[in-house]
Amino acid sequence: VVNWFKKNKRDLPWRNTSPWGVMVSEYMLQQTPVNRVLPKWHEWMERWPTPKHLASATPAQVITAWGRLGYPRRALRLHAAAQIIAEDFNNQVPEDQETLQLLPGIGEYTAAAIAAFAFEQRSLVMDVNIRRLLVRAIDGQEHPKPAPTAQEKARRLAILPTKNAHVWAAATMELGALVCTSKNPSCELCPIIGQCNWRKNGYPRTELVRKSQDWQGTDRKCRGTIVQALRENESLTESAIKKLWPDESQVEKALKTLLEDQLIQALPRRRYRLPQ
């Protein structure tokens, strides 16, 4: 797997950057594909090359710069984390996973990924691509469970290399992303096809649990429409915002949750803007 990775890996900029660059990429990649993250990551690193630079920005600048990456709360959490790092950690991303998890927006997975890819630590990175590759190769199943169980973590930790575990993590992640894909995997290109238990078992199918709600009518789509309009305007009245969406009650709900998440600010005379 590692030899395959050395020959076939993508030239992703956060593989040759500072710990801060790795951290920014991990926030962006949490729920957004690589091809959409690439241009935004370059923009952010050019504009805010260290935590201190981002810490000095306003929330409105941060949300606007986040663009259409989705889930803009990630931008505010990254902004808050940058302020803590600049103030409490001398502008240096902490190396310890427990300390990393104290920062806004960093859970167990993101802390493990930063530890591995920024500091070359032996940490258990349980990315969806890694999980899918290993559940097929080792367990002979098509797809992993929605969330890793304690048993799965223990089994994966048992096979984690003692040396260069960060390279193993990057290699298995890349193999899962490029070859052992969720749909239509390119098994003929896989370097471990001879050891794959899913193949040996005759490729048994596993039904994926999928959300049924159409994105176009979701509350998240409504929220995104409002935030995008406020990126493009200094402020908007509630009546103007309601014209952006066919369901007024959904707009009212979206405004309420956006205020709770501190993604927008209420102004006098029922106007709204991005937080300053």
Walk through the language-model features, giving the residues of each:
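A short, conserved structural fragment
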Residues: 259-272
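Catalytic cores of DNA base-excision repair glycosylases
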Residues: 3-221, 229-249
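C-terminal engagement modules used by replication, chromatin/transcription, nuclear envelope/ESCRT
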Residues: 275-276
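Short amphipathic alpha-helical interaction segments
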Residues: 245-259
